[in-house]
Amino acid sequence: MSQFFYIHPDNPQARLINQAVEIVRKGGVIVYPTDSGYALGCKIEDKGAMERICRIRQLPDGHNFTLMCRDLSELSTYAFVDNVAFRLMKNNTPGNYTFILKGTKEVPRRLLQEKRKTIGMRVPSNPIAQALLETLGEPMLSTSLMLPGSDFTESDPEEIKDRLEKVVDLIIHGGFLGQQPTTVIDLTEDTPVVLREGVGDRTFTAADPAC
C-alpha cells in the first residue's frame, strides 16, 4: 500500500518533500506532479525501480526515459550541450520542454537510446517537482504517467490512487493537472528539430546565434 501526500502546489511543505525524497533514495517509485501532468519517478541508478515503472506502464524494452534536472548546470553534467543548445535551453527552461541530447558517461548505458546514445532531459517549473529535485540533489529518472490503453497523461491524483496505490510507494497529490505532453526538441544536430508538439510553445525562442 502506497503513501499519499497532499503537498501544496505553490508552497511545498519541506517536511513532506524530505519524506518523499527519502522514499526515492531507498529505491521507491513515486507519482509526482510536473508541468505536463503526473509522472512516475525513481533514482537514476535503481534498475529495479525502473523495471517496476516499465511494468506499471507496460513499456517495451528500450523505452526512452527522461532525466528530470533541477537546472541547466545539473543537466550539463549528464548531457553534452553546445553553445547553440545552451542558449536555446536557457531561454526555455524551466518549462514544458523535453530536450533530446547526447548523454555523457554519467548516464547509465541502459538509459541511453541504443543507436544514437541520446537521452531526454527536462528542467520542470512545477514547484513540487523542483523541490523534490533540489532536495534529492541529482536528476530523477522519469516518464509520463500514461496508463496502458490511454493516450493521455493522468491528471487526477484521486483516480491515480485508486488504480496505483498497490504498485507504487508514494503518490503526491499536487492538484489537478493538464494532460498535454511536453514539446520534444532534438538538439543533437546543428538545427533544432521539433519531434513532438505539446504544451510547450511551438515557436520556442533561441538567443541570437551571434551573441
Model-flagged regions — what are they?
Residues M1-C211:
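Active-site-adjacent structural elements in enzyme catalytic cores
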